[in-house]
Amino acid sequence: MAEQRFYATGKRKTSIARVWLKPGEGNITVNRRTLDEYFGRETSKMVIRQPLELTDNMGKFDIMVNVCGGGPSGQAGAIKHGITKALLEADPELRGVLKKAGFITRDSRAKERKKYGRKGARARFQFSKR
């Protein structure tokens, strides 16, 4: 019999994370590296563990993540979103707790595009009166 695995994708800014959950001892692997090897900042690691700590599933699942695009902060957010969705697939009863914490909703904030005739998205070029 094949072991039970739960799959979900998470997104944040320009990062996309593919997450696989399987019952295990709590190992988190990101792009074939351990969580500590991949993320240097403690805040990123904390963000990733949030849904597991909230639902008391720390150490119950082995998590394998494949993440691409964006920077460390966006990737951490994408992994968090993916883990949340995978946990929901594993146990739909967690929906209320995760929804209340705001983990299910995809954070739609992204970089605003640069407009023509301007220096950036909102900033104007320097104005010279004379």
Curated annotation (Swiss-Prot):
Record key words, sorted: Ribonucleoprotein, Ribosomal protein
Compositional bias of kind Basic residues: 111-130
Region (Disordered): 110-130
One annotated Gene Ontology cellular component of this protein: cytosolic small ribosomal subunit
InterPro entries per record: Ribosomal_Su5_D2-typ_SF (IPR020568), Ribosomal_uS9 (IPR000754), Ribosomal_uS9_bac/plastid (IPR023035), Ribosomal_uS9_CS (IPR020574), Ribsml_uS5_D2-typ_fold_subgr (IPR014721)
Entry-linked PROSITE patterns: RIBOSOMAL_S9
Single GO biological process annotation from the record: translation
Lineage: superkingdom: Bacteria
This protein's record includes keyword Heme: no
MF term (GO), any: RNA binding
Family of this protein: Belongs to the universal ribosomal protein uS9 family.
NCBIfam families: PRK00132.1 (NF001099)
PANTHER family according to UniProt: RIBOSOMAL PROTEIN S9, SMALL RIBOSOMAL SUBUNIT PROTEIN US9M
Name of the protein described by the UniProt record: Small ribosomal subunit protein uS9
Origin species: Syntrophotalea carbinolica (strain DSM 2380 / NBRC 103641 / GraBd1)
